[in-house]
Amino acid sequence: MEAVETQEQATEQDRGTVKITICKSLSGIAEGAELVYQEFEKQIKELEANAELGPGGCSMGQVGCRGYCSKDVLVDVYVPGQDPVTYEKVKPDMVIKILKDHIIGGKVFKKAAAKEDYYENIKKQQRVALEFGGKIDPENIDEYIEVGGYSGLKKALQMKPSDIIEDIIASGLRGKGGGGFVTGYKWKKAANAPTDDLGTRYIMVNGDEGNPASYMDRSVMEGCPHQVVEGLIIGAYAIQATEGIIYTRSDYAIAVRRLNMALKQARERGLLGKNIGGTDFSFDIYVHEGMEAFIGGESTALMASVEGKRPFPKAQPPHSTEKGLWGKPTLLNNAETWATVSAILKKGSKWYSSMGNDNAKGTKVWALSGNIKYNGLMEFDMSTTFREVIEDVCGGISKKKELKVIHAGGVTGGFLPPSKADTPLDYESLLNEGVLMGQASFAAYDESACVIDLAKFSVGFNEAETCGKCTPCRIGLTLIKNKLDDISEGRGKLEDLDKLQSLCEEINVTALCGLGETAVKAVLTGIKYFRAEYERHIVDQTCDAARCTGLYKYVVKEEDCVACGACIKPCPTGAITGGTRKVAAHIDMDLCINCNACYEACAFLAIV
């Protein structure tokens, strides 16, 4: 393939003696990456005009997301003969110091330099789908080819389609969008499904993420769109698909732009279109921008959206591999899965299956949040446990507090207690504990979190996002939310817990689609593992975390108040008086809205 043969030429291109790259992911841009980039360009131009830089000068570049969103804007400096240095939380006013101290003076600007834990964090990951995040320009096909991009496709085009499918089966790859179905067997079903006289068969990328805590697919598509495109072409050749569609949300503007750019570049290199790589295989891809709805990510609803219909889920079977888009066999995997396919073809199925455990091979990208020191996107071997991620990679629970609850799987996931922290992050291990991997986000919370409050958010989100087609979701979720409101506001009864559990179990087995089935996991696992906390809300009318403010009237213990005034400023209604000049604070409950701001502000536990 001519496009891949340019790798050696690309490697030899002069990129300047010193190279500076800036993270231009969505979070990076939100933190001011464009301003930082412009400041670098401006300062480099001035330094070059004054002959202050070396003869090689500096080259500028952009890179995609590497997952460390809390550290943006990230800047990497590559000086020949030295280890690369990453700078974090860079602002425009730091640019001149980085240039003068590091590039001209030869000394790292330590104030902004990433600490050792940043590098250790990366070493503890196994990055496959995120391999090129932070390393290459996502808008430059030559940089992707330079690191081995499209070599997996080159290898695939020299194989029989059926052999590619067997290779994917041997790798142990499973879908990374929730259910974890074995990818190779899904491909085989699509490849063997009867077609029309024209052999019409579709292949798709599910790049839609409705879970508010999940952004893995967006980051993969933004950070290395060619990796997704290459995987999709390989899959298309394996099942002999006639057309490819990348379905993503219209509000993923950066991902959409970069995907379209990648498709254009691939066509120009002969990697898409007629007779790909000199073979008789012809195939093309287009991007479909869908609506911003949680239900839009469900496979049958997604296909209905592409067909121009309202995105309602359909009962299965028949499955989409037999009768999908416009009634034709359709293969659908998410963006992370397609990015992994290209790596497997390039490095081999044995390489991929060497990672993971007996339940699941390979790796998974997780979106991490909560009361942990480091959050963002990280990719781990499937055998990694919650405890290893929280303590070894994420720096443990912040502010030296204790882990109380792990919320795994986002709004369709569930809760686990600290005693389950040694559970591996694979499909079966999670399922055995009553939670699903779902869209692979997990949050670790300390004792300031309330399980009932967290469950209210999950159920409330799912209630708002339900398509309303089936009664279990449309009516059941509202009933559950009302019961949770009663418990959190002092109207709950002990018998409500059994009613809640029974109702959730009914929805779990009768909902039309997978999203409905999992919409109640937060309540089921909450009652299973944190029943005592539910009972304290009902019997004692107390919330240990003081999150369920409907249970409380706030009182200042005068003997503990030091009159520091810390509680006055955060009060949004001016309900607090005193608190200064040795006069204890006082809360006017007629003005208090139970927002909990004063409780959180008091360092002396004087507000109860």
Range-by-range predicted roles:
Residues 224-238:
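Histidine-anchored nucleotide/phosphate-binding helix
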Residues 360-374, 386, 544-582, 586-589, ...:
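C-terminal accessory/binding modules appended to enzymatic or scaffolding proteins
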Residues 110-170, 333-348:
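Flexible inter-domain linker/hinge segments
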Residues 2-18, 33-60, 75-106, 151-170, ...:
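Ferredoxin-type iron-sulfur electron-transfer modules in oxidoreductases and energy-metabolism complexes
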Residues 256-382, 394:
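Hydrophobic alpha-helical positions that pack around
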Residues 136-138, 144-151, 206-217, 320-325, ...:
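Gly-rich Lys/Arg/Thr-decorated short loops/hinges at beta-loop-alpha junctions or inter-strand turns
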Residues 231-233, 382-398:
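Short amphipathic, charge-patterned alpha-helical segments
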Residues 154-197, 353-354, 359, 367, ...:
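Accessory "access/gating" subregions that flank catalytic or transport cores
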